[in-house]
A protein has these predicted regions:
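C-terminal regulatory/interaction module of P-loop NTP-utilizing enzymes
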Residues: 1-146
């Protein structure tokens, strides 16, 4: 709305003066898509990348919605965008592991935010194992072979 970003989060979003803003007759706000629409977008990405998992798509959308609500309520400083969900889907097709994909795509956030986002996903998708749990299980399997 012309107020810019002084925290450095968005480069090039300077505060615009009122005379310049007055040249625009309308302002359009683009909210995030509804859960149903966003799920269609995520499913489309999955089809595009050749890895369709409807339950994972539903869980990703639910997870993003909870984070956005928390962001708007002032509880966190970061947000999960639809674009980031697309990145997670793409990473999932590469690594074939949900948590690895999520962890790789939230790695740019600070440690507390990253940990809270990952922890939240494990609550949304109760059947998923964190990378640490997967590693421990793999190590146990290797030890049991010998």
């Amino acid at each position: 709305k012309g107020k810019g970003s002084e925290d450095g989060r968005f480069i090039g979003t300077n505060i615009l003066n009122e005379a310049f803003l007055e040249r625009f007759a309308i302002t359009v706000e683009q909210p995030y898509p509804t859960a149903a629409t966003e799920k269609k977008i995520v499913m489309g990405s999955m089809k595009k990348y050749g890895e369709v998992d409807e339950e994972f798509a539903t869980n990703l959308v639910t997870w993003a919605e909870v984070i956005r609500k928390t962001f708007y309520d002032g509880g966190v400083d970061e947000i999960i965008s639809t674009r980031r969900l697309d990145h997670i889907v793409k990473a999932f097709t590469i690594f074939k592991d949900k948590m690895t994909a999520i962890e790789m795509c939230v790695a740019r956030f600070d440690e507390d935010t990253k940990e809270s986002f990952i922890d939240l996903y494990t609550k949304v998708d109760a059947g998923v194992m964190t990378s640490e749990e997967t590693e421990e299980k793999t190590e146990e399997g290797v030890e049991n072979e010998f």
